[in-house]
């Protein structure tokens, strides 16, 4: 290949297929940040989902801030009618993958059954994804089955997999099959490095790239309520929102000006409302799910943000990053890897929610912070977020990784069966034969 062609390919916009279980998800707006950052850099992203159209889709797309022009390919009845033809075209790779799934079914019976049921949709996605430069599994779950199918075909797209919270907890055949077929494996916390290095094949590069947040412009300080506390999460028992209410109740006993606003929704909402009502906590306001931008405004008006989650899969929650960028004094549970976000008490406080009084003591200290101390803390926290947790900067790191793999020697088939399927516009793309990536 000529040097000029290499330079052109190295700077050309990438076509990226993003694979999701479902999209969008209210508690995963970081996915939208990734896609928006890629689009802002000139790359073309198409979303493929394993699950069908969500309820109240238009409202969900709006509240999550999904770009209007983003193509989203979901399973549907018309899509399912095309699955038999796709399965026939992919009968070799599909049969091999089914065999791999069945071989592990004794150890993972439920996951194996789910994987077999998802196989037709995975084949349909793989059939369309051949025309892309990159196919990225956002989670190493059922939709990640697309990667071993593409690998078996030696299709052109670079195959990468993210391993995160759900994958670490499941640690099952879906993770093994997805990661085993990836040409690069990414996770978002240094605490996960040992795991992904153990899971990835020896020749496959691994990299830690943090989930980023958009650096929303900041408002002027001076409008912050010094006694306003907030939390934001899915309202499920593992998020321990009751622990936040109890900590604020203890702080309010010392100063009745303390209030708590709770943002989010979920099955635990009714119980939390009843818990507060029975105790006469009229200063607790459960306000439901709001847009990311609206939540950020609330953060900039609050003094303290608390997240006392006990969820085993909690890793560097983006809502904590947003609270730090907004200038809140942050109190977080000691979830794995949280020290990457809160290196010491000058950035925020880490507590063990299982230790009686730990959150209450941290909250009293946060509410007693001087304005000078708060100003210094905000400057340090914002510098950390800008340097390590900007979605624009971190998606540039993804692009660099994808380009490195694209430009490395790879084995790509030129057989008719492995050529990309025609796009909706009738376009196809030729494929080069290259030696295997080492």
Residue ranges, per PLM feature:
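Carbohydrate-associated surface elements
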Residues: 191, 212
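Conserved donor-binding/catalytic core segment of Leloir-type glycosyltransferases
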Residues: 186, 213, 217-239, 245-250, ...
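Conserved acidic donor-binding segment of nucleotide-sugar-dependent glycosyltransferases
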Residues: 344-357, 366-371
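Short alpha-helical donor nucleotide-sugar binding micro-motif in glycosyltransferases
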Residues: 289-290, 297-302
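A short, well-ordered alpha-helix in the C-terminal region of glycosyltransferases
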Residues: 252, 373-397
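Nucleotide-activated donor-binding/catalytic signature segment of Leloir-type glycosyltransferases, i.e.
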Residues: 270-293
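Short alpha-helical segment that forms part of, or immediately flanks, the ligand-binding pocket
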Residues: 296, 314-325, 339-340
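Acidic donor-binding loop of glycosyltransferase active sites
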Residues: 300-314, 328
């Amino acid at each position: 290949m000529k040097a000029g062609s290499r330079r052109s390919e190295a700077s050309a916009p990438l076509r990226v297929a993003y694979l999701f279980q479902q999209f969008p998800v209210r508690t995963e707006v970081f996915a939208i940040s990734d896609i928006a950052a890629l689009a802002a850099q000139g790359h073309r992203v198409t979303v493929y989902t394993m699950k069908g159209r969500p309820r109240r889709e238009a409202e969900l797309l709006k509240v999550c801030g999904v770009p209007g022009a983003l193509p989203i390919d979901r399973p549907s009845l018309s899509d399912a009618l095309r699955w038999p033809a796709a399965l026939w075209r992919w009968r070799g790779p599909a049969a091999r993958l089914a065999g791999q799934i069945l071989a592990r079914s004794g150890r993972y019976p439920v996951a194996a059954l789910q994987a077999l049921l998802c196989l037709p949709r995975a084949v349909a996605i793989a059939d369309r994804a051949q025309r892309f430069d990159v196919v990225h599994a956002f989670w190493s779950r059922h939709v990640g089955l697309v990667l071993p199918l593409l690998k078996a075909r030696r299709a052109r797209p670079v195959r990468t997999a993210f391993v995160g919270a759900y994958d670490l907890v499941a640690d099952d055949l879906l993770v093994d099959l997805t990661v085993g077929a990836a040409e690069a494996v990414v996770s978002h916390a240094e605490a996960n490095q040992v795991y992904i290095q153990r899971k990835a094949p020896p020749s496959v590069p691994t990299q830690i790239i943090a989930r980023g947040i958009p650096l929303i412009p900041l408002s002027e300080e001076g409008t912050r309520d010094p006694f306003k506390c907030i939390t934001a999460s899915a309202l499920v028992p593992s998020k321990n929102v009751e622990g936040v209410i109890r900590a604020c109740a203890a702080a309010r006993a010392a100063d009745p000006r303390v209030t708590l606003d709770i943002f989010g929704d979920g099955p635990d909402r009714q119980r939390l409302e009843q818990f507060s009502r029975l105790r006469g906590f009229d200063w607790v306001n459960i306000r439901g799910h709001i847009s990311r931008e609206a939540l950020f405004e609330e953060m900039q008006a609050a003094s303290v943000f608390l997240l006392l989650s006990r969820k085993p899969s909690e890793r560097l929650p983006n809502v904590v990053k947003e609270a730090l960028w907004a200038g809140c004094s942050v109190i977080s549970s000691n979830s794995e890897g949280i020290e990457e976000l809160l290196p010491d008490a000058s950035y925020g406080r880490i507590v063990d929610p299982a230790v009686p009084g730990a959150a209450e003591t941290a909250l009293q200290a946060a509410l007693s912070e001087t304005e000078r101390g708060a100003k210094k803390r905000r400057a340090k926290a914002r510098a950390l977020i800008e340097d390590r947790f900007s979605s624009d900067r971190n998606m540039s790191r993804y692009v660099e990784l994808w380009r490195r793999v694209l430009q490395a020697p790879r084995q790509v088939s030129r057989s008719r069966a492995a050529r990309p399927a025609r796009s909706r516009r009738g376009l196809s793309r030729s494929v080069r034969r290259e030696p295997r990536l080492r």
